[in-house]
Amino acid sequence: MIGKHCILELCECNSVKLDDEAFIRTTIQMASKVAGAQLLNLITHKFVPQGVTGLALLAESHISIHTWPESGYAAVDVFTCGDQTMPDKACQLLVEELQSKRHSLKTLRRDTPVMISNALIN
Amino acid sequence: MIGKHCILELCECNSVKLDDEAFIRTTIQMASKVAGAQLLNLITHKFVPQGVTGLALLAESHISIHTWPESGYAAVDVFTCGDQTMPDKACQLLVEELQSKRHSLKTLRRDTPVMISNALIN
Protein backbone atom coordinates (compact mmCIF):
# COMPACT_ATOMS: atom_id res chain seq x y z
CA MET A 1 0.00 0.00 0.00
CA ILE A 2 1.31 3.43 -0.96
CA GLY A 3 -0.65 5.39 1.62
CA LYS A 4 -3.69 5.95 3.76
CA HIS A 5 -6.03 8.83 2.94
CA CYS A 6 -8.45 9.99 5.63
CA ILE A 7 -11.40 12.02 4.36
CA LEU A 8 -12.97 13.87 7.23
CA GLU A 9 -16.13 15.97 7.20
CA LEU A 10 -16.41 18.17 10.29
CA CYS A 11 -19.81 19.65 11.09
CA GLU A 12 -21.20 21.88 13.79
CA CYS A 13 -17.72 23.27 14.46
CA ASN A 14 -16.85 26.45 16.30
CA SER A 15 -17.37 29.00 13.52
CA VAL A 16 -15.02 31.56 15.05
CA LYS A 17 -12.17 29.04 14.99
CA LEU A 18 -13.03 28.00 11.42
CA ASP A 19 -12.52 31.60 10.33
CA ASP A 20 -9.27 32.16 12.25
CA GLU A 21 -6.34 31.72 9.86
CA ALA A 22 -3.71 31.74 12.63
CA PHE A 23 -5.66 29.12 14.55
CA ILE A 24 -5.93 26.93 11.46
CA ARG A 25 -2.16 27.21 10.92
CA THR A 26 -1.39 26.23 14.49
CA THR A 27 -3.90 23.38 14.39
CA ILE A 28 -2.40 21.96 11.19
CA GLN A 29 1.05 22.10 12.78
CA MET A 30 -0.28 20.21 15.80
CA ALA A 31 -2.05 17.69 13.57
CA SER A 32 1.15 17.00 11.64
CA LYS A 33 2.99 16.42 14.88
CA VAL A 34 0.50 13.99 16.43
CA ALA A 35 0.38 12.10 13.13
CA GLY A 36 4.13 11.58 13.42
CA ALA A 37 4.63 13.41 10.13
CA GLN A 38 7.30 15.89 9.08
CA LEU A 39 5.88 19.27 8.06
CA LEU A 40 7.94 20.68 5.17
CA ASN A 41 5.78 23.64 4.14
CA LEU A 42 2.46 25.20 5.09
CA ILE A 43 0.36 27.70 3.17
CA THR A 44 -2.94 29.24 4.17
CA HIS A 45 -5.42 31.66 2.64
CA LYS A 46 -8.14 33.71 4.29
CA PHE A 47 -11.15 34.25 2.07
CA VAL A 48 -13.45 37.28 2.09
CA PRO A 49 -16.01 37.46 3.58
CA GLN A 50 -15.19 34.20 5.38
CA GLY A 51 -13.42 30.87 5.15
CA VAL A 52 -9.87 29.60 5.40
CA THR A 53 -7.88 27.08 3.39
CA GLY A 54 -4.73 25.47 4.75
CA LEU A 55 -2.42 23.11 2.86
CA ALA A 56 0.43 21.32 4.59
CA LEU A 57 3.14 19.68 2.51
CA LEU A 58 4.42 16.72 4.50
CA ALA A 59 7.40 14.47 3.89
CA GLU A 60 4.71 11.76 3.97
CA SER A 61 2.11 13.49 1.67
CA HIS A 62 -0.32 16.24 2.81
CA ILE A 63 -3.01 17.66 5.06
CA SER A 64 -5.68 19.98 3.65
CA ILE A 65 -8.39 21.95 5.43
CA HIS A 66 -11.12 24.03 3.80
CA THR A 67 -13.55 25.80 6.09
CA TRP A 68 -17.04 27.26 5.66
CA PRO A 69 -17.60 29.16 8.94
CA GLU A 70 -21.08 30.22 7.84
CA SER A 71 -22.06 26.53 7.80
CA GLY A 72 -19.89 25.39 10.71
CA TYR A 73 -18.29 22.95 8.26
CA ALA A 74 -14.74 21.93 7.35
CA ALA A 75 -13.59 19.49 4.66
CA VAL A 76 -10.35 17.83 5.78
CA ASP A 77 -7.93 15.41 4.12
CA VAL A 78 -5.05 13.71 5.88
CA PHE A 79 -3.02 11.64 3.42
CA THR A 80 0.08 9.93 4.77
CA CYS A 81 2.43 7.29 3.46
CA GLY A 82 4.53 4.79 5.31
CA ASP A 83 3.96 2.66 8.37
CA GLN A 84 5.19 5.21 10.90
CA THR A 85 2.44 7.80 10.53
CA MET A 86 -0.91 7.91 12.31
CA PRO A 87 -3.36 9.97 10.24
CA ASP A 88 -6.24 8.90 12.51
CA LYS A 89 -4.62 10.77 15.38
CA ALA A 90 -4.45 13.93 13.28
CA CYS A 91 -8.15 13.54 12.49
CA GLN A 92 -9.05 13.11 16.13
CA LEU A 93 -7.09 16.24 17.04
CA LEU A 94 -8.88 18.24 14.34
CA VAL A 95 -12.30 17.06 15.56
CA GLU A 96 -11.40 18.24 19.06
CA GLU A 97 -9.64 21.50 18.21
CA LEU A 98 -12.38 22.68 15.85
CA GLN A 99 -14.98 21.53 18.39
CA SER A 100 -16.93 19.52 15.86
CA LYS A 101 -20.10 18.04 17.34
CA ARG A 102 -20.73 15.77 14.36
CA HIS A 103 -18.25 14.28 11.94
CA SER A 104 -17.75 11.61 9.32
CA LEU A 105 -14.46 9.84 8.61
CA LYS A 106 -13.74 7.64 5.63
CA THR A 107 -10.38 6.04 4.95
CA LEU A 108 -9.16 5.17 1.49
CA ARG A 109 -6.05 3.26 0.66
CA ARG A 110 -4.06 4.94 -2.08
CA ASP A 111 -2.30 2.60 -4.40
CA THR A 112 -1.90 1.56 -7.99
CA PRO A 113 -5.18 0.65 -9.79
CA VAL A 114 -4.45 -3.07 -9.61
CA MET A 115 -4.37 -2.86 -5.85
CA ILE A 116 -7.29 -0.55 -5.16
CA SER A 117 -10.23 -2.71 -6.14
CA ASN A 118 -11.07 -2.78 -2.46
CA ALA A 119 -10.11 0.83 -1.92
CA LEU A 120 -12.60 1.64 0.82
CA ILE A 121 -11.19 -0.05 3.90
CA ASN A 122 -13.18 1.78 6.56
CA MET B 1 -23.26 19.68 -2.39
CA ILE B 2 -20.18 21.48 -1.12
CA GLY B 3 -17.74 20.08 -3.65
CA LYS B 4 -16.52 17.34 -5.93
CA HIS B 5 -13.33 15.47 -5.05
CA CYS B 6 -11.61 13.48 -7.78
CA ILE B 7 -9.17 10.84 -6.54
CA LEU B 8 -6.90 9.82 -9.37
CA GLU B 9 -4.30 7.06 -9.38
CA LEU B 10 -1.89 7.40 -12.31
CA CYS B 11 0.20 4.36 -13.21
CA GLU B 12 2.81 3.57 -15.82
CA CYS B 13 3.60 7.27 -16.16
CA ASN B 14 6.70 8.81 -17.71
CA SER B 15 9.12 8.52 -14.78
CA VAL B 16 11.32 11.38 -15.97
CA LYS B 17 8.34 13.75 -15.92
CA LEU B 18 7.25 12.46 -12.51
CA ASP B 19 10.63 13.49 -11.12
CA ASP B 20 10.74 16.92 -12.79
CA GLU B 21 9.65 19.55 -10.26
CA ALA B 22 9.39 22.34 -12.85
CA PHE B 23 7.28 20.13 -15.08
CA ILE B 24 4.97 19.25 -12.19
CA ARG B 25 4.55 22.97 -11.39
CA THR B 26 3.68 23.82 -14.97
CA THR B 27 1.31 20.87 -15.23
CA ILE B 28 -0.55 21.87 -12.06
CA GLN B 29 -0.91 25.41 -13.42
CA MET B 30 -2.35 23.99 -16.65
CA ALA B 31 -4.66 21.66 -14.72
CA SER B 32 -6.01 24.56 -12.66
CA LYS B 33 -6.69 26.50 -15.82
CA VAL B 34 -8.56 23.76 -17.68
CA ALA B 35 -10.60 23.08 -14.55
CA GLY B 36 -11.74 26.69 -14.64
CA ALA B 37 -10.24 27.25 -11.20
CA GLN B 38 -8.33 30.22 -9.82
CA LEU B 39 -4.83 29.31 -8.63
CA LEU B 40 -3.98 31.37 -5.53
CA ASN B 41 -0.76 29.67 -4.41
CA LEU B 42 1.41 26.74 -5.44
CA ILE B 43 4.12 24.95 -3.48
CA THR B 44 6.27 22.04 -4.57
CA HIS B 45 8.98 19.91 -3.02
CA LYS B 46 11.58 17.70 -4.69
CA PHE B 47 12.49 14.67 -2.62
CA VAL B 48 15.86 12.92 -2.56
CA PRO B 49 16.59 10.54 -4.20
CA GLN B 50 13.34 10.94 -6.18
CA GLY B 51 9.75 12.10 -6.08
CA VAL B 52 7.90 15.40 -6.20
CA THR B 53 4.95 16.77 -4.26
CA GLY B 54 2.90 19.69 -5.53
CA LEU B 55 0.06 21.42 -3.68
CA ALA B 56 -2.08 24.06 -5.36
CA LEU B 57 -4.29 26.29 -3.25
CA LEU B 58 -7.30 27.20 -5.36
CA ALA B 59 -10.07 29.70 -4.75
CA GLU B 60 -12.26 26.60 -5.18
CA SER B 61 -10.25 24.16 -2.93
CA HIS B 62 -7.05 22.32 -4.01
CA ILE B 63 -5.05 20.09 -6.31
CA SER B 64 -2.39 17.76 -4.91
CA ILE B 65 0.12 15.56 -6.69
CA HIS B 66 2.55 13.11 -5.09
CA THR B 67 4.85 11.18 -7.40
CA TRP B 68 6.87 7.97 -7.08
CA PRO B 69 9.03 7.98 -10.23
CA GLU B 70 10.62 4.66 -9.27
CA SER B 71 7.15 3.07 -9.57
CA GLY B 72 5.83 5.22 -12.42
CA TYR B 73 3.01 6.20 -10.05
CA ALA B 74 1.34 9.45 -9.00
CA ALA B 75 -1.43 9.98 -6.44
CA VAL B 76 -3.56 12.96 -7.47
CA ASP B 77 -6.46 14.80 -5.85
CA VAL B 78 -8.53 17.48 -7.54
CA PHE B 79 -11.07 18.94 -5.13
CA THR B 80 -13.20 21.80 -6.40
CA CYS B 81 -16.29 23.57 -5.15
CA GLY B 82 -18.99 25.34 -7.06
CA ASP B 83 -20.79 24.64 -10.30
CA GLN B 84 -18.35 26.47 -12.54
CA THR B 85 -15.34 24.18 -12.15
CA MET B 86 -14.54 21.04 -14.11
CA PRO B 87 -12.23 18.81 -12.05
CA ASP B 88 -12.64 15.98 -14.57
CA LYS B 89 -10.90 18.10 -17.19
CA ALA B 90 -7.95 18.64 -14.86
CA CYS B 91 -7.74 14.89 -14.33
CA GLN B 92 -7.78 14.20 -18.05
CA LEU B 93 -4.99 16.72 -18.60
CA LEU B 94 -2.89 15.10 -15.87
CA VAL B 95 -3.37 11.64 -17.39
CA GLU B 96 -2.16 12.97 -20.72
CA GLU B 97 0.70 15.19 -19.53
CA LEU B 98 2.18 12.52 -17.26
CA GLN B 99 1.67 9.96 -20.04
CA SER B 100 -0.13 7.51 -17.79
CA LYS B 101 -0.94 4.26 -19.56
CA ARG B 102 -3.24 3.04 -16.80
CA HIS B 103 -5.29 5.04 -14.35
CA SER B 104 -8.16 4.89 -11.91
CA LEU B 105 -10.51 7.77 -11.13
CA LYS B 106 -13.00 7.90 -8.29
CA THR B 107 -15.19 10.87 -7.52
CA LEU B 108 -16.47 11.67 -4.06
CA ARG B 109 -18.94 14.35 -3.18
CA ARG B 110 -17.81 16.39 -0.22
CA ASP B 111 -20.55 17.54 2.05
CA THR B 112 -21.87 17.49 5.57
CA PRO B 113 -22.30 13.98 7.09
CA VAL B 114 -26.07 14.08 6.68
CA MET B 115 -25.64 14.47 2.95
CA ILE B 116 -22.81 12.03 2.26
CA SER B 117 -24.49 8.71 2.90
CA ASN B 118 -24.18 8.15 -0.83
CA ALA B 119 -20.75 9.73 -1.03
CA LEU B 120 -19.38 7.66 -3.89
CA ILE B 121 -21.09 9.03 -6.97
CA ASN B 122 -18.80 7.57 -9.63
Curated annotation (Swiss-Prot), chains A, B:
UniProt GO molecular function: adenosylmethionine decarboxylase activity
Record's catalysed reaction(s): S-adenosyl-L-methionine + H(+) = S-adenosyl 3-(methylsulfanyl)propylamine + CO2
Gene Ontology terms: cellular component: cytosol
Domain of life: Bacteria
Cofactors required: pyruvate
Annotated Pfam families: AdoMet_dc
EC number: 4.1.1.50
PTM characteristics: Is synthesized initially as an inactive proenzyme. Formation of the active enzyme involves a self-maturation process in which the active site pyruvoyl group is generated from an internal serine residue via an autocatalytic post-translational modification. Two non-identical subunits are generated from the proenzyme in this reaction, and the pyruvate is formed at the N-terminus of the alpha chain, which is derived from the carboxyl end of the proenzyme.
Pathway this chain belongs to: Amine and polyamine biosynthesis; S-adenosylmethioninamine biosynthesis; S-adenosylmethioninamine from S-adenosyl-L-methionine: step 1/1
Entry annotation: catalytic residues: S61, H66, C81
GO biological process: spermidine biosynthetic process
Record key words, sorted: Autocatalytic cleavage, Decarboxylase, Lyase, Polyamine biosynthesis, Pyruvate, S-adenosyl-L-methionine, Schiff base, Spermidine biosynthesis, Zymogen
Positions bearing Pyruvic acid (Ser): S61
Role played: Catalyzes the decarboxylation of S-adenosylmethionine to S-adenosylmethioninamine (dcAdoMet), the propylamine donor required for the synthesis of the polyamines spermine and spermidine from the diamine putrescine.
Family according to the record: Belongs to the prokaryotic AdoMetDC family. Type 1 subfamily.
The protein's name in its UniProt record: S-adenosylmethionine decarboxylase proenzyme
